[in-house]
Swiss-Prot record:
The record marks 713 as: Interaction with coactivator LXXL and FXXFY motifs. Residues 226-236 have a biased composition (Polar residues). One of its GO terms (molecular function) is DNA-binding transcription factor activity. This is Androgen receptor.
Length: 912
């Protein structure tokens, strides 16, 4: 049996009509103890409820309305023998409402033995409630009692016999000022809330007007505001003044009793502030925008048997961990402004718990619902199906919580996303929120790919009770039945703003790579994560692989063109003309090694002029260009039928290949674009082993491949090839180019006695045997010795290396095979002209050309053997612990088998 505790006594639960709050019970008990300090009658103590004495007082008030107040009776009858009480004093006791306080002799008449009022048996049988009487105007003696407290008599009879000290404390000016300030703040808060509601309703009305034909408009179903159960709790029919309500709230909160915290609100405000309690106070709740959040936060005010339900127990971990401190004002919910209408979701922009940013952008996307979330919103549906297509989506940032957030988020993140997907809300019979999820998904890629982004992939179709597997932060393929149309989902930029969740930078799953290779260090940008592909589906723009070469070879500034035989800027062009034609002698103040760049090119003219000569700038190249232009003009005047396009082509061709004497312009370009020295990063302090040597060679190969790409894209005419042909030529010829360049380095640095792969990786006889590729190393050393035997010049080496790039093609041909053949023929002619520059005898030129072409043919068998060796090593790399960089492994596994199978063959100058 539930009982009420008073001061010194235990009372049974009062009837429903006399059921009072904690505030009223407290002062009722205080009043009874003060007025009757003596022992009570046992029968009255056991049977009389706390409100019986109050009802007896009202009965006496109706019978003795004509009598004077108790204080005046005490003052006028001092000679009756009864002890006279002082009027004021620290220990004296007075009633709050003196007009309704019965006199002592009247109470003595009713029960002379015990001094207690009789039990209200007659009134309870007749059904008469507490009859309210209008208070009489107070006398002059009662002027100290404030008028506000005198109004509490009819409504709160329990306060009518409060002590003088308590009365004085409650009537202090500071307390009244505090109540007034609270009332003002409350009114200001209500005004701000009303303004926010009006603004949000206007935005929703604008969105509904612009929506597609009104088909996707938000239908708002009219429903009455829920009636709070606290009205019946306080008596229902009683009308409580504002001051009394505030006083009750202030005292109750100060005493830790939060039962009356929401009584001062209007019915509409009670819906907003108390919506978290509505579904559990009995009966099916009305349509409330905050109803789905009921199981997630708050406690139940009802003390009935429904307090310990499964729903409340299910979400108890989340209530204590996340929803602590939330009150009615912190919720992003408000009542609807429509008459009798249900409240719709209103999310202020200042709340961090709910989505607010994308709602401000809704004006640009009125036809859809945009809710920015990072994880799938999973959980049980609300008790009644919501008529609003976009209500109750709650947001949490997974980065703001600890490891326990994932379990809690699955319980409290759920919503009705019917407008985002064609259906698919979890059925009402689903179990825990973690086991069910909404099938509302959005596609990150195209509808054909069907790749989904999210923590779990749900099954489509919108069936009820379908269970899905939850995979946090996973990338899963869709199951059968889930199809994405282009117009069903918003663009990815709306779902994923800057900095929230990063997008997958690959157009398809086949392009995903596990790491970034060192070869991409010089290619940071939007295409930095891509690799070379064989098909056109994933081909990048040509400017990525082969951007134009526009850097001055002297100072590094932006080049304006080819001046005096070199690619230079306008400043270096003018400087070289004046310095070369002038008779002034320049002397460097330092050691002839000054730095010449864009900002310090004018500091040392001697070093700048020396660098111009090293780049190949000559005054004779200017004269040759003028002669070529004059010859073009004469040919243009002779033939009038030539089109302007053909004239431009002839002009470029003649200026490029006509009349070389000792320093052709073509060689200047080849010298300028020649790669520098690349190190392998090998640790020579460690003992040589097969795995260490081969791993260092693979790392060196990837680093050199970066320079090969940069060198090839700077070759004249190479960028005019088809983009597929460019990639194919590089992927097929990279091994021959590296072997040829390594042979030249071995010849120039160590006189072909060892293999000079890199400054930190030089192979001697011991390392050749240790690497298990001794036969290949011997052939490469023989190639290096050929450079010395044939006395190959640097100019011949540069031209032969460029020609070697165009010496291997697929058997089926390239995309633009005709242009490739023309470009290859031009480089062959350039090699022939370089040979003819230093040899006047035609027979000697032909013999030299034969020797150089035989040397080029000898590179192809060596490259083939190395292709076979690297392919076998890649297959056994896990067994022998040899590391292969990612790009090297890709090219060897994809392109090398084409060469070994005969689909790609080299082009030989001589019959093999």
């Amino acid at each position: 049996m539930e009982v009420q505790l008073g001061l010194g006594r235990v009372y049974p639960r009062p009837p429903s009509k006399t059921y009072r709050g904690a505030f009223q019970n407290l002062f009722q008990s205080v009043r009874e103890v003060i007025q009757n300090p003596g022992p009570r009658h046992p029968e009255a103590t056991s049977a009389a409820p706390p409100g019986a004495r109050l009802q007896q007082q009202h009965q006496h008030q109706q019978q003795h309305q004509h009598e004077t107040s108790p204080r005046r009776q005490q003052q006028q009858q001092p000679e009756d023998g009864s002890p006279q009480r002082p009027s004021r004093g620290p220990t004296s006791y007075l009633a709050l409402d003196e007009e309704q306080q019965p006199s002592q002799h009247q109470s003595a008449k009713g029960h002379p033995e015990s001094g207690c009022v009789p039990e209200p048996v007659a009134m309870s049988r007749t059904g008469k409630g507490l009859e309210q009487q209008q208070p009489a105007p107070p006398d002059e003696d009662d002027s100290a009692a404030p008028s506000t407290l005198s109004l509490l008599g009819p409504t709160f009879p329990g306060l009518s016999s409060c002590s003088t000290d308590l009365k004085d404390i409650l009537s202090e000016a500071g307390t009244m000022q505090l109540l007034q300030r609270q009332r003002q703040r409350q009114q200001q808060r209500q005004q701000q809330q009303q303004q926010q509601q009006q603004q949000q309703q206007q935005q929703q009305q604008q969105q509904e007007v612009v929506s597609e034909g009104g088909s996707s408009g938000r239908a708002r179903e009219a429903a009455g505001a829920p009636t709070s159960s606290k009205d019946s709790y306080l008596g229902g029919s009683s009308t409580i003044s504002d001051s009394a309500k505030e006083l009750c709230k202030a005292v109750s909160v100060s005493m830790g009793l939060g039962v009356e915290a929401l009584e001062h609100l209007s019915p509409g405000e009670q819906l907003r502030g108390d919506c978290m309690y509505a579904p559990l106070l009995g009966g099916p709740p009305p349509v409330c925008p905050c109803a789905p959040l009921t199981e997630c936060k708050g406690s139940v005010l009802d003390d009935g048997p429904s307090k310990g339900t499964e729903e409340t127990a299910e979400y108890s971990p989340f209530k204590t961990g996340y929803a602590k401190g939330l009150d009615g004002d912190s919720l992003g919910c408000s009542g609807s402004s429509q008459a009798g209408g249900s409240g719709t979701l209103e999310i202020p922009s200042t709340l961090s718990l709910y989505k607010s940013g994308t709602l401000d952008e809704a004006a640009a996307y009125q036809s859809r619902d945009y809710y920015n979330f990072q994880l799938s919103l999973a959980g049980p549906p609300p008790p009644p199906p919501s008529p609003h297509p976009h209500a109750r989506i709650k947001l949490e940032n997974p980065l703001d919580y600890g490891s326990a957030w994932a379990a809690a988020a699955a319980q409290c993140r759920y919503g009705d996303l019917a407008s985002l997907h064609g259906g698919g809300a979890a059925g009402p019979g689903s179990g825990s929120p973690s086991a069910t999820a909404s099938s509302s998904w959005h596609t990150l890629f195209t509808a054909e790919e069907g790749q989904l982004y999210g923590p779990c992939g749900g099954s489509g179709g919108g069936g009820t009770g379908e269970s899905v597997s939850v995979t946090p932060y996973g990338y899963t393929r869709p199951q059968q039945g889930l199809t994405g149309q282009e117009g069903d989902f918003p663009p990815p930029d709306v779902w994923y703003p800057g900095g929230v969740v990063s997008r997958m930078p690959y157009p398809s799953a086949s392009c995903v790579k596990s790491e970034m290779g060192p070869w991409m260090e010089s290619y940071s940008g939007p295409y930095g994560d891509m690799r070379l592909e064989t098909t056109r589906d994933h081909v990048l723009p040509i400017d990525y692989y082969f951007p134009p070469q526009k850097t001055c070879l002297i100072c590094g500034d932006e080049a304006s063109g080819c001046h005096y035989g070199a690619l230079t800027c306008g400043s270096c062009k003018v400087f070289f003309k004046r310095a070369a034609e002038g008779k002034q002698k320049y002397l460097c103040a330092s050691r002839n090694d000054c730095t010449i760049d864009k900002f310090r090119r004018k500091n040392c003219p001697p070093c700048r002029l020396r660098k111009c000569y090293e780049a190949g700038m000559t005054l004779g190249a200017r004269r040759l260009k003028k002669l070529g232009n004059l010859k073009l003009q004469e040919e243009g005047e002779a033939s009038s039928t030539t089109s302007p396009t053909e004239e431009t082509t002839q002009k470029l061709t003649v200026s490029h290949i006509e009349g070389y004497e000792c320093q052709p312009i073509f060689l200047n370009v080849l010298e300028a674009i020649e790669p520098g020295v690349v190190c392998a990063g090998h640790d020579n302090n460690q003992p040589d082993s097969f795995a260490a040597l081969l791993s260092s060679l693979n790392e060196l190969g990837e680093r050199q491949l970066v320079h090969v790409v940069k060198w090839a894209k700077a070759l004249p005419g190479f960028r005019n090839l088809h983009v597929d042909d460019q990639m194919a030529v590089i992927q097929y010829s990279w091994m021959g180019l590296m072997v040829f360049a390594m042979g030249w380095r071995s010849f120039t640095n160590v006189n072909s006695r060892m293999l000079y792969f890199a400054p930190d990786l030089v192979f001697n006889e011991y390392r050749m045997h240790k690497s298990r590729m001794y036969s290949q190393c011997v052939r490469m050393r023989h190639l290096s010795q050929e450079f010395g035997w044939l006395q190959i010049t640097p100019q011949e080496f540069l031209c032969m290396k460029a020609l070697l790039l165009f010496s291997i093609i697929p058997v089926d041909g390239l995309k633009n095979q005709k242009f490739f053949d023309e470009l290859r023929m031009n480089y062959i002619k350039d090699l022939d002209r370089i040979i003819a520059c230093k040899r006047k005898n035609p027979t000697s030129c032909s013999r030299r050309f034969y020797q150089l072409t035989k040397l080029l043919d000898s590179v192809q068998p060596i490259a083939r053997e190395l292709h076979q060796f690297t392919f076998d090593l890649l297959i056994k790399s896990h067994m022998v612990s040899v590391d292969f960089p990612e790009m090297m492994a890709e090219i060897i596994s994809v392109q090398v088998p084409k060469i070994l199978s005969g689909k790609v063959k080299p082009i030989y100058f001589h019959t093999q």
